[in-house]
């Protein structure tokens, strides 16, 4: 579930297996026993040795395993073809996974492709970090100036431009303009 949460948490907020089944895989369980009841059924079996109610536990566990297999394939596909993501939150999140792994080329493609909303500002910040790490100062400046021109990113682009001009380009006078 950890890998699924890294991809889907930004969009879904809650990422229990049942949430992922329903909202990512489109699976809705019928006549399923809630996982919270399983320990009590197990304790009852230990006391009575009546295994009749354990069948529902086995069925529940089988569904869990099957869902995890389908979810694993879905996550694999999301990483293999990140640009096929329907939701910008998922595309941004896949970019973060690649960013964390040092695969800046793929992360950059994901971040650049994020088109709207809150994720666009987060993608701009993440792209700035990649450009700084890879010493692409001109790209960072262009991105940050674009963020300022479009009035996105709040104070972030101003602070980052000031840092670039003061520390990297050694132009403290220019840094003060931001």
Which residue ranges define each predicted feature?
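Structural motif corresponding to the intra-repeat A-B loop/turn of tetratricopeptide repeats
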Residues: 101, 134, 168-169
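Structural register within alpha-helical repeat arrays
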Residues: 94, 126-127, 131, 161, ...
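Short coil turns that delineate tetratricopeptide repeat
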Residues: 118-119, 152
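Metal-dependent phosphoesterase core characteristic of DEDDh/y 3'-5' exonuclease domains
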Residues: 1-66
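Residue at a conserved register position within TPR or TPR-like alpha-solenoid repeats
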Residues: 98, 131, 165-166
